[in-house]
Design a protein with these regions (language model features):
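Bacterial Sec-dependent N-terminal signal peptides
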Residues: 2-3, 13-48, 116-151, 351, ...
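Conserved structural position at the C-terminal beta-strand
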Residues: 112-114
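Short beta-strand segments within Ig-like beta-sandwich modules, predominantly Fibronectin type-III
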Residues: 83-91
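Acidic, Ser/Thr
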Residues: 55-63
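Conserved positions within compact, well-structured domain cores
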Residues: 132-356
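Surface-exposed, short loops/turns at beta-strand junctions within beta-sandwich domains
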Residues: 98-105
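Hydrophobic/tyrosine-rich beta-strand signature of extracellular beta-sandwich/beta-rich modules
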Residues: 108-110
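Short strand-edge motifs at loop-to-beta-strand transitions and within beta-strands
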Residues: 91-97
């Protein structure tokens, strides 16, 4: 009998012994349980410094007696906090917690209890995020304070963006995060969507727009870049990286330049673009692409988000039939590709300063 088999046999024997002891103990002491299942939800993402309200429900006392509730948020709380108000099984019980100033992941644990009964518990995780760009926010790794960047403030909502000049045009170096509905002058085109429908993520990953929304979302004096603007950007990137731009075309593949547009950034200290040896991330254009993926939107269904750690996808103003041209970067390939997407696709938007 080899060592692995000995270990497996020992583990099995211990499990059988433990089960035997447990059965004998269960015969001696019966544990009483509360009725129902504890339900509470924590938002997936929250802004640092914000106040979050939680509501727990779903549990009742078998004898309709009062229930108590205590909770703990970690990191942040050294010990649990018991609520003074008795738990209401019909309407639930709500409490608030103020999120700290540091972007991080929290665990929220909730317990409902009654004398003589085993407590019912549930836990959720949530991630706090910050749009600060001074090195203490959620996105770090890009030095926007270098002399290569300028800034622009959108008068519509007061949000500011870093900009960079590349390919003879001034580009947003961050994804547009305008959250209000846009119009083509005659029709309301609706709003874009933030990542996983979390408002807290709007200023982190930007807003995901359909192509028609993207055509009208940029502030006055800025526009959705067309294929020619992207081509000029790609040619400059090729020069920066010392690769040939021969064969580059508006709707073609930009060979060997993806790293010139990618930034080696982290989200809450976790690297966004996984390392692949064939992709040399230099961000030599200052474009600062993040791996935010794309979304599929359709009618009243909840948008589905994909490839947030694998791709960066950007609309252009060019169309073909009822589709729009987009360019995309993948984590494991040095080339920038192009494709055509229908109106059910939502992607990131980089505004470029209007030529006129």
């Amino acid at each position: 009998m080899n060592f692995k088999k000995i270990l497996r046999t020992a583990v099995f024997a211990a499990a059988v012994a433990l089960a035997t002891v447990s059965c004998k103990k269960d015969e001696e002491t019966a544990v009483a349980y509360l009725s129902g299942s504890l339900v509470f939800k924590a938002p997936g993402y929250v802004k640092t410094g914000s106040e979050v309200t939680f509501t727990a429900s779903g549990v009742t006392h078998p004898e309709n007696k009062p229930l108590g509730l205590y909770y703990k948020v970690t990191p942040g709380m050294e010990k649990s906090d018991t609520l003074d108000v008795p738990f209401d099984p019909e309407n639930g019980l709500s409490w608030t917690y103020t999120i700290g100033d540091e972007p991080q992941t929290y665990t929220v644990a909730c317990y409902v209890f009654a004398t003589g009964y085993s407590a019912s518990s549930s836990s959720q995780t949530m991630v706090s995020v910050s749009s600060r760009t001074d090195g203490t926010g959620s996105i770090t790794g890009t030095d926007f304070n270098s002399g290569a960047y300028s800034s622009f403030t959108d008068e519509r909502d007061g949000k500011s963006y870093f900009t960079v000049t590349a390919g003879g045009r001034e580009w947003f170096a961050q994804n547009l995060a305008y959250e209000e509905a846009v119009s083509d002058g005659e029709n309301d085109l609706g709003c874009g969507v933030p990542y996983v429908n979390s408002e807290a993520m709007a200023d982190i990953f930007g807003i995901y727009y359909t192509q028609e929304q993207a055509r009208h979302a940029c502030p006055d004096g800025w526009e959705l870049p067309d294929g020619e603007a992207w081509l000029a950007l790609a040619v400059e990137a090729a020069g920066n990286e010392g690769v040939s731009s021969d064969g580059f075309a508006v709707a073609g593949t930009f060979t060997g330049i993806a790293g010139a547009l990618m930034t080696d950034a982290a989200f809450n200290t976790i690297t966004m673009w996984e390392y692949w040896p064939q992709v040399k991330i230099t961000n030599s254009t200052g474009f600062s692409a993040l791996s935010t993926g794309f979304a599929t939107v359709s009618g009243d269904t909840v948008p589905a988000f994909e490839a947030a750690t694998q791709k960066a996808v950007f609309w252009t103003a060019d169309t073909e039939g009822d589709t729009g041209l987009y360019h995309y970067i993948t984590v494991d390939n040095p080339d920038i590709y192009s494709g055509y997407g229908y109106e059910s696709m939502a992607a990131s938007l980089r505004c470029v300063k209007s030529a006129n």
